[in-house]
Swiss-Prot record:
Membrane topology term: Single-pass type II membrane protein
Record keyword Glycosyltransferase present: yes
Listed name of the protein: Beta-1,3-N-acetylglucosaminyltransferase radical fringe
Positions annotated as active site in the UniProt record: 238
Organism annotation: Mus musculus
Temperature dependence: Optimum temperature is 37 degrees Celsius.
Cross-referenced InterPro entries: Fringe (IPR017374), Fringe-like_glycosylTrfase (IPR003378)
Disulfide bonding pattern of the chain: 115-126, 144-208, 312-321
Amino acid sequence: MSRARRVLCRACLALAAVLAVLLLLPLPLPLPLPRAPAPDPDRVPTRSLTLEGDRLQPDDVFIAVKTTRKNHGPRLRLLLRTWISRAPRQTFIFTDGDDPELQMLAGGRMINTNCSAVRTRQALCCKMSVEYDKFLESGRKWFCHVDDDNYVNPKSLLHLLSTFSSNQDIYLGRPSLDHPIEATERVQGGGTSNTVKFWFATGGAGFCLSRGLALKMSPWASLGSFMSTAERVRLPDDCTVGYIVEGLLGARLLHSPLFHSHLENLQRLPSGAILQQVTLSYGGPENPHNVVNVAGSFNIQQDPTRFQSVHCLLYPDTHWCPMKNRVEGAFQ
């Protein structure tokens, strides 16, 4: 064997030995795949409620304020001075008497319902009937009813309504009872009466209806039908709304803790949450201490309802708010 062939054979043997050693070595483990991040329980899902709701503008909301001629003085002027000044195009005042001066202050959005000024079930239902018809005429997406002792936070209201679709059956508010109301439904023609149970949102805290639901209510609510429907159960206006929505249409009241009436203990509302509420109220002469506990530049004698204090915290740039509020608001 020539010397060249011997060298080649040795090289082949060496290569074979190296390959044998490599085959005996353990194979390396595959690199682990990167893990998906653990879900964050506090993170809001990408598909949030707002994607299913409306992109609302302030003028999409119709706010009806129910009042009476005797409250056209300080009570209603307080609302015009505070929250209505921030939502003038949204707000319509429904009353029972003409008042040219107040009509001018309200920008022409005060409506004389020609209903009785006496606080009876029939008079209340008369006003609600007019409110409902005016809302349908407006073409707006949402109807919200409040009383003349409510402070409305327009920003909170718009934010809340934006989480729903106005095409869906939405009835939103706060019940004053912890159980459904039970009523006797009188059948036309003097037939057998039925017992019906349903929830209703108290008008004293305010409530809202989507246009989709309001249109379905039309056979029992439009063009004066609301009053005859109320006579079937002989209940006030807010109860009749609940009767139509739940008892006749089978929709449901969505209970919201953001609406407040004078019937609850308002001092129990946490002060840190007051500015996020949709509506507030106050106790009035019969219960003057039932007001929200909010600090402000006005004392209780200057601001017995606490509405001015709340307003200056929400809108410190208001010209009549104390300078302290305006300076603090500039740095927020």
